[in-house]
């Protein structure tokens, strides 16, 4: 007989989860900082989104639309989708959690990749299932490695495309091959948080695969190119059976009215989105060229961030660079937890921030 408990105890596995640690926002003793650690857009949200958000403030006593119809319809209109296949949530993180809650349990396995988004592992373990990590090949998802890891216990596969923190992507032909090789009951989750930034002819965010299959879902976010990270707005495109299952456990009012209004206005303002994408493309090229010229190695990125690898020598490692940059007010993201102990991830920021990092790293790399 087990000993009597004298306090509440979480179910097995919960205390084995390493809590997610966001990118830092402040540096002690530094008045002005440039936060380049969370992949936020330097252009901010669309003025139309701000206007819609402000207008919603006059009705805060009213519950929001539990179906988020205005937002779902806006997404459907912009992408040419059926509104019945769209589910919105309090950030795509909530939707990923719902998927795990509904489709995973004790004894199940879910496959993640070596450098994948840390939230996947947290949600999988939170559902009582076991995460199975597969190696990537040169910072790119290896489809053959994923297929080789499938067992009778596999119920879900998570794939960030583009990847975070690598910024690399998997061509649509490889995604199709992955889906075709998975058992039909295994859910393939395509996390396309950075899809709007990709300018590659062989990339497809997931709309096509979801439309033609019953076991594929795609998640997207308004936290990146749309500049609504503070409001927590995400959406999912999935088969109606999966949408129905998630709706059965989803909170009845899981999104605020201001978030719904701002999201709908933001996605309809595609002209503003293109400004953000153009700014990113311009500075991505400049930053990569400059950093490479300094002797740094950069992982090719199609997103809005750059993974910068530092020399393995005293005074020049990523930890040294992080401290050097932080003292000057430039906050990049340490990515040791993603398997890159000697790299930093930099968000493509404003012109002022980008030029500042260039100057700081030029000084850093030139030190004796």
From Swiss-Prot:
E.C. designation(s): 2.6.1.9
CDD domains assigned to the protein according to its UniProt record, in alphabetical order: AAT_like (cd00609)
Lineage: Bacteria, Pseudomonadati, Pseudomonadota, Alphaproteobacteria, Hyphomicrobiales
Known partners and oligomeric status: Homodimer.
Signal peptide: none
Pathway: Amino-acid biosynthesis; L-histidine biosynthesis; L-histidine from 5-phospho-alpha-D-ribose 1-diphosphate: step 7/9
Name of this protein: Histidinol-phosphate aminotransferase
A molecular function (GO) term: histidinol-phosphate transaminase activity
One Pfam family this sequence matches: Aminotran_1_2
Positions bearing N6-(pyridoxal phosphate)lysine: 224
Record keywords, A-Z: Amino-acid biosynthesis, Aminotransferase, Histidine biosynthesis, Pyridoxal phosphate, Transferase
Organism: Agrobacterium fabrum (strain C58 / ATCC 33970) (Agrobacterium tumefaciens (strain C58))
Gene Ontology biological-process annotations: L-histidine biosynthetic process
Cofactors: pyridoxal 5'-phosphate
Catalytic activity, reaction form: L-histidinol phosphate + 2-oxoglutarate = 3-(imidazol-4-yl)-2-oxopropyl phosphate + L-glutamate
InterPro entries: Aminotransferase_I/II_large, HisP_aminotrans, HistidinolP_aminotransfase, PyrdxlP-dep_Trfase, PyrdxlP-dep_Trfase_major, PyrdxlP-dep_Trfase_small
Similarity comment text for this entry: Belongs to the class-II pyridoxal-phosphate-dependent aminotransferase family. Histidinol-phosphate aminotransferase subfamily.
Name of the gene: hisC
């Amino acid at each position: 007989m087990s000993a009597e408990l004298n306090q509440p105890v979480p179910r097995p596995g919960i205390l084995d989860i390493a809590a997610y640690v966001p990118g830092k926002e402040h540096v002690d003793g530094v008045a002005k900082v440039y936060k380049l650690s969370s992949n936020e857009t330097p252009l901010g949200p669309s003025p139309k989104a701000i206007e819609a958000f402000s207008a919603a403030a006059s009705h805060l006593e009213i519950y929001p639309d539990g179906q988020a119809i205005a937002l779902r319809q806006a997404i459907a209109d912009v992408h040419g989708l059926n509104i019945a296949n769209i589910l919105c949530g309090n950030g795509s993180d909530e939707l990923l959690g719902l998927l795990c809650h509904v489709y995973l349990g004790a004894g199940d396995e879910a496959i993640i990749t070596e450098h994948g988004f840390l939230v996947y592992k947290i949600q999988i373990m939170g559902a009582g299932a076991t995460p199975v990590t597969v190696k990537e090949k040169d910072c790119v998802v290896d489809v053959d490695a994923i297929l080789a890891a499938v067992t009778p216990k596999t119920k879900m596969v998570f794939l960030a495309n583009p990847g975070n923190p690598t910024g690399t992507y998997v061509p649509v032909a490889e995604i199709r091959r992955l889906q075709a090789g998975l058992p039909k009951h295994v859910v393939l989750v395509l996390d396309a948080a950075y899809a709007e930034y990709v300018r590659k002819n062989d990339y497809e965010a997931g709309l096509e695969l979801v439309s033609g299959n019953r076991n594929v879902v795609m998640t997207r976010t308004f936290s990146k190119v749309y500049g609504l990270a503070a409001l927590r707005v995400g959406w999912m495109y999935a088969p109606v059976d999966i949408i129905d299952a998630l709706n059965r456990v989803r909170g009845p009012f899981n999104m605020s009215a201001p978030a719904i209004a701002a999201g709908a206005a933001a996605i309809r303002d595609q002209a503003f989105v293109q400004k953000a994408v153009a700014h990113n493309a311009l500075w991505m090229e400049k930053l990569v060229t400059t950093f490479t010229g300094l002797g740094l190695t950069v992982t090719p990125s199609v997103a809005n961030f750059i993974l910068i690898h530092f020399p393995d020598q005293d005074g020049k490692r990523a930890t040294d660079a992080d401290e050097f940059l932080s003292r000057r007010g430039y906050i990049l993201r340490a990515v040791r937890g993603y398997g890159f102990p000697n790299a930093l991830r930099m968000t493509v920021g404003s012109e002022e921030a980008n030029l500042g990092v260039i100057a700081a790293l030029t000084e850093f790399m030139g030190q004796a």
